[in-house]
């Protein structure tokens, strides 16, 4: 028999002990200290307080008078916040909300309760938005919370054009203002915005802030200002201020030629869930700049998340929602020639893309799990519409709305019908949802749905885009009336793609010119608005052949499609079948340019050392 001592940890005993301490606290048994705040008494146990708070631990172990007292008065402490901290000490439970978190953080900071501080930090970082980021920046600076401060600062930089007129911005300290105005990461397209922000802050309290005139104006990069702005600005200055302004601008001279981050952003086509060349991952995300004809790597959604909904807001915020993730401990075969052996779980995840950090940031999940929901932004809210789900027909009808300021979802009126697939667009603050030959319009202010005119053709997996007061429904698969067989829209051989246009003012559909694609083009195109033009991104080769992509542009007056750009095979390789495509403005300097390399399936088994690419013969690299 082994003499080795056997040790087991009884976790149930630990839980029981905590419950017993809580019972003693509630019944005021064996208490040995009374905390007094604003006339309210809190009988407690020194041992419990010292366990969670460095402040109380130092107080009770110092040997000073407080360590021997039975009653301790705490000043500058909020009674409600103290009650929450005491409850946490006895239970480990902490209910944080918008109305209590800042006072709770302040009290926990004074009492040095690190667990509560961490919970509050995580909550505040998650809640940062354009409405509160400036205030939270000042709050974090006051309490020396560097993690919260950096997160708030990034949001101020990202939303600068929306926040620099806020009252909280006017009340920023001089040091924080300089930190912001000097940042290379300001998301501004013109330096005039920075100049205006600086002048507004100085003029908010001219008497007390005149001493900062030189230091504030030295953050303006005068070379980036237009000549008209420079001349008008100097002419409008009081004579006594001109020398100070010149001195301040002279200090900014070394930064003259460095543009702000927002001045470098490019409108790009963003591809989510593209086929991945990485054997350890199913999917990848890339973006393509039509101006530079370059492809950049985008941070892929966490945990191989796929079958998501995507949306880009008018403020250029990118969100994804729903989808599926692979289950853990399941065998996965990522080979393109083998059948996938992965089990998936449907999720209600919701992420915001931090373009400066090139990372996905989790937000409050949706109320329902959804696969490929339609996402749109209407009147400042994000709507998640339908999508396939595990809840059957009822769940497919559900619609929920996300409040970006409150970071919360609420349900709205459901769809009149249940669909596994739909496309949605926004025109004149109304949401239009389409599938097959049906279309419904949602009016947010009355929370109601109305059936609109039916289309002339019944198509699934089409792409929809709003352009002016018109809705374009393009491509997809035509549903044969009798057999239900899905055929390419337009011609059977894929040499043209069907287009229908809806006029929201007349409530009527009409056929438009087909897209003159090549034979065997993929009918499931992606319609986007880029550079203020309606375009279609499509694959002009059969799915079994090498991928060749093009974009077509539509001329509304002439009702004609023309080839806009042929995308070189050197730039963009096979994206697969199910990728999402949207358009947003991104910063090339924050992305990694994707290097060109010949795909493995181009290597010929007969030993050929070159192949044709874009009409040229390209030699394979040496092995």
Curated annotation (Swiss-Prot):
<dbReference type="GO" id="GO:0010467">
    <property type="term" value="P:gene expression"/>
</dbReference>
<comment type="pathway">
    <text>Protein modification; protein ubiquitination.</text>
</comment>
<keyword id="KW-0880">Kelch repeat</keyword>
<feature type="repeat" description="Kelch 2">
    <location>
        <begin position="381"/>
        <end position="429"/>
    </location>
</feature>
<dbReference type="GO" id="GO:0005737">
    <property type="term" value="C:cytoplasm"/>
</dbReference>
<dbReference type="Pfam" id="PF00651">
    <property type="entry name" value="BTB"/>
</dbReference>
<dbReference type="InterPro" id="IPR011333">
    <property type="entry name" value="SKP1/BTB/POZ_sf"/>
</dbReference>
<dbReference type="InterPro" id="IPR017096">
    <property type="entry name" value="BTB-kelch_protein"/>
</dbReference>
<dbReference type="InterPro" id="IPR006652">
    <property type="entry name" value="Kelch_1"/>
</dbReference>
<feature type="repeat" description="Kelch 4">
    <location>
        <begin position="470"/>
        <end position="529"/>
    </location>
</feature>
<feature type="modified residue" description="Phosphoserine">
    <location>
        <position position="300"/>
    </location>
</feature>
<dbReference type="InterPro" id="IPR015915">
    <property type="entry name" value="Kelch-typ_b-propeller"/>
</dbReference>
<keyword id="KW-0677">Repeat</keyword>
<dbReference type="GO" id="GO:0043491">
    <property type="term" value="P:phosphatidylinositol 3-kinase/protein kinase B signal transduction"/>
</dbReference>
<dbReference type="InterPro" id="IPR000210">
    <property type="entry name" value="BTB/POZ_dom"/>
</dbReference>
<feature type="domain" description="BTB">
    <location>
        <begin position="31"/>
        <end position="98"/>
    </location>
</feature>
<dbReference type="GO" id="GO:0032868">
    <property type="term" value="P:response to insulin"/>
</dbReference>
<dbReference type="InterPro" id="IPR011705">
    <property type="entry name" value="BACK"/>
</dbReference>
<dbReference type="GO" id="GO:0006629">
    <property type="term" value="P:lipid metabolic process"/>
</dbReference>
<dbReference type="GO" id="GO:1990756">
    <property type="term" value="F:ubiquitin-like ligase-substrate adaptor activity"/>
</dbReference>
<dbReference type="GO" id="GO:1900076">
    <property type="term" value="P:regulation of cellular response to insulin stimulus"/>
</dbReference>
<feature type="repeat" description="Kelch 1">
    <location>
        <begin position="317"/>
        <end position="380"/>
    </location>
</feature>
<comment type="subunit">
    <text>Component of the BCR(KBTBD2) E3 ubiquitin ligase complex, at least composed of CUL3, KBTBD2 and RBX1. Interacts (via the BTB domain) with CUL3.</text>
</comment>
<dbReference type="InterPro" id="IPR030586">
    <property type="entry name" value="BTB_POZ_KBTBD2"/>
</dbReference>
<dbReference type="Pfam" id="PF07707">
    <property type="entry name" value="BACK"/>
</dbReference>
<keyword id="KW-0597">Phosphoprotein</keyword>
<protein>
    <recommendedName>
        <fullName>Kelch repeat and BTB domain-containing protein 2</fullName>
    </recommendedName>
</protein>
<feature type="repeat" description="Kelch 3">
    <location>
        <begin position="431"/>
        <end position="469"/>
    </location>
</feature>
<dbReference type="GO" id="GO:0070936">
    <property type="term" value="P:protein K48-linked ubiquitination"/>
</dbReference>
<comment type="function">
    <text>Substrate-specific adapter of a BCR (BTB-CUL3-RBX1) E3 ubiquitin ligase complex that acts as a regulator of the insulin signaling pathway, modulating insulin sensitivity by limiting PIK3R1/p85alpha abundance in adipocytes. Targets PIK3R1, the regulatory subunit of phosphatidylinositol 3-kinase (PI3K), for 'Lys-48'-linked polyubiquitination and proteasome-mediated degradation.</text>
</comment>
<feature type="repeat" description="Kelch 5">
    <location>
        <begin position="535"/>
        <end position="581"/>
    </location>
</feature>
<dbReference type="Pfam" id="PF01344">
    <property type="entry name" value="Kelch_1"/>
</dbReference>
<feature type="domain" description="BACK">
    <location>
        <begin position="133"/>
        <end position="229"/>
    </location>
</feature>
<dbReference type="InterPro" id="IPR047074">
    <property type="entry name" value="KBTBD2_BACK"/>
</dbReference>
<keyword id="KW-0833">Ubl conjugation pathway</keyword>
<dbReference type="GO" id="GO:0006006">
    <property type="term" value="P:glucose metabolic process"/>
</dbReference>
């Amino acid at each position: 028999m082994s003499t080795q001592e056997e040790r087991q940890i009884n976790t149930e005993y630990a839980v029981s002990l905590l419950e017993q301490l809580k019972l003693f606290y509630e019944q005021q048994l064996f208490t040995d200290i009374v905390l007094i705040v604003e006339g309210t008494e809190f009988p407690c146990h020194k041992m419990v307080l010292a366990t969670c708070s460095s402040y109380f631990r130092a107080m009770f172990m110092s040997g000073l008078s407080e360590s021997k007292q039975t009653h301790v008065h705490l000043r500058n402490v909020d009674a409600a916040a103290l009650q929450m901290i005491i409850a946490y000490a006895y239970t480990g439970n902490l209910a944080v909300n918008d109305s209590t978190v800042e006072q709770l953080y302040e009290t926990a900071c004074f009492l040095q309760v690190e667990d509560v501080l961490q919970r509050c930090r995580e909550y505040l970082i998650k809640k940062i938005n354009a409405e509160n980021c400036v205030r939270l920046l000042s709050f974090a600076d006051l309490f020396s919370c560097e993690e919260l401060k950096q997160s708030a600062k990034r949001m101020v930089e990202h939303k600068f054009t929306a926040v620099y007129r806020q009252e909280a911005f006017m009340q920023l300290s001089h040091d924080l203002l300089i930190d912001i105005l000097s940042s290379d990461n300001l998301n501004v397209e013109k330096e005039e915005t920075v100049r205006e922000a600086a002048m507004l802050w100085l003029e908010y309290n001219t008497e007390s802030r005149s001493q900062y005139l030189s230091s504030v104006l030295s953050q303006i990069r005068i070379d980036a200002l237009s000549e008209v702005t420079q001349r008008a600005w100097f002419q409008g200055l009081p004579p006594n201020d001109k020398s100070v302004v010149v001195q301040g601008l002279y200090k900014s001279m070394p930064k003259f030629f460095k543009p702000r981050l927002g001045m470098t952003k490019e409108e790009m086509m963003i591809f989510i869930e593209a086929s991945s060349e990485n054997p350890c991952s199913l999917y990848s995300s890339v973006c393509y700049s039509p101006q530079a004809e370059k492809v950049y790597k985008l941070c892929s959604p966490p945990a191989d998340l796929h079958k998501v909904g995507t949306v880009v807001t008018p403020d250029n915020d990118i969100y994804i929602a729903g989808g599926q993730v692979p289950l853990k401990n399941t065998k996965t075969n990522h080979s393109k020639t083998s059948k996938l052996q992965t089990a998936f779980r449907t999720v209600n995840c919701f992420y915001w893309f931090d373009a400066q950090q090139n990372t996905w940031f989790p937000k409050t999940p949706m109320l329902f799990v959804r696969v490929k929901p339609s996402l749109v932004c209407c009147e400042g809210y994000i709507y998640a519409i339908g999508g396939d789900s595990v809840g059957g027909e009822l769940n497919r009808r559900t619609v929920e709305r996300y409040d970006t300021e409150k970071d919360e979802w609420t349900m709205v009126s459901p769809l009149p019908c249940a669909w596994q697939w739909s496309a949605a667009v926004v025109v004149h603050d109304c949401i239009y949802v389409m599938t097959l030959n049906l279309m419904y319009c949602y009016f947010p202010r009355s929370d109601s749905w109305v059936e609109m005119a039916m289309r002339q053709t019944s198509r699934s997996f089409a792409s929809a885009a709003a352009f002016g007061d018109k809705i374009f429904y393009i491509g997809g698969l035509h549903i044969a009336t009798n057999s239900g067989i899905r055929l390419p829209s337009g011609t059977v051989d894929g040499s043209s793609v069907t287009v229908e246009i809806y006029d929201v003012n007349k409530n009527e559909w009409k056929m438009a010119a087909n897209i003159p694609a090549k034979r065997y083009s993929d009918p499931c195109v992606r319609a986007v608005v880029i550079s203020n033009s309606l375009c279609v991104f499509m694959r002009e080769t059969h799915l079994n052949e090498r991928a060749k992509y093009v974009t077509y542009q539509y001329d509304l007056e002439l009702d004609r499609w023309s080839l806009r750009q042929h995308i070189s095979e050197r730039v963009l390789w096979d994206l697969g079948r199910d990728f999402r495509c949207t358009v947003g403005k991104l910063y090339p300097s924050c992305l990694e340019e994707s290097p060109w390399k010949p795909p493995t399936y181009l290597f010929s088994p007969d030993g050929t050392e070159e192949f044709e690419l874009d009409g040229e013969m390209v030699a394979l690299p040496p092995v």
